[in-house]
């Protein structure tokens, strides 16, 4: 039996290494990329960075996932999307709820239409806090939206409240 030459061993190692790197690049490219959510107009506000440190790891049993966009947080497959740095709403006749000391306005103009005209998402916005925090919840997650707002309350309360719902 003839031993392989050094050249054959080096060439075989290089080919094998290249194949391994190519397989790794292919596997990485097949991973889902984080959702790109448009940042709020004032997402760079220092209070947004402060509250982000206290976002819960899970909402509605969904893990917090990576998201592109400053001031943006996402749980699950975008079941819940949070954007900090919104312009505070003016006094409104839209439904306003106080959940554990945080006032939230259900923005009727911001809910999006799904198939068949049903509302596929609901958008809530903190009231009386600057910057405001917007939370968008899918229709499937809407039945537990109260739980979501309770879970987000600890983080959001770090933004001082300057006005209350009527």
Language-model regions, residue ranges each:
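N-terminal export and membrane-targeting signals
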Residues: 1-16
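C-terminal region of N-terminal signal peptides and the immediate post-cleavage residues
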Residues: 7-9, 23-45
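Extracytoplasmic/periplasmic/luminal assembly and interaction segments
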Residues: 53-100
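Short, intrinsically disordered, charge-biased short linear motifs at domain edges
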Residues: 34-35, 68-73, 151-152
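Extracytosolic low-complexity repeat regions of secreted or lipid-anchored proteins
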Residues: 93-166
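Generic solvent-exposed, charged/amphipathic alpha-helical segments
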Residues: 52-57, 153, 157
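N-terminal signal-anchor transmembrane alpha helix of single-pass membrane proteins
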Residues: 16-24
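Exposed, flexible binding/inhibitory loops of compact, secreted disulfide-stabilized domains
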Residues: 43-49, 162, 166
């Amino acid at each position: 039996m003839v031993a392989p030459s050094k050249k054959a061993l080096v060439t075989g190692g290089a080919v094998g290494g290249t194949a391994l790197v190519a397989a790794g690049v292919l596997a990485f490219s097949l991973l889902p990329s984080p959702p790109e959510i448009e940042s709020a107009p004032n997402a760079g506000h220092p209070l947004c960075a402060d509250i982000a440190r206290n976002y819960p790891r899970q909402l509605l049993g969904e893990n917090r996932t990576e998201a592109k966009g400053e001031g943006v947080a996402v749980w699950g497959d975008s079941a819940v999307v949070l954007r900090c740095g919104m312009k505070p709403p003016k006094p409104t006749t839209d439904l306003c709820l106080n959940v554990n000391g945080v006032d939230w306005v259900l923005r009727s103009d911001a809910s999006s239409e799904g198939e068949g005209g049903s509302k596929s998402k609901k958008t809530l916005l903190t009231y009386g806090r600057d910057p405001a925090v917007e939370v968008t919840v899918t229709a499937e997650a809407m039945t537990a939206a109260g739980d979501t707002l309770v879970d987000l309350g600890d983080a959001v309360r770090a933004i001082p409240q300057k006005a209350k719902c009527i």
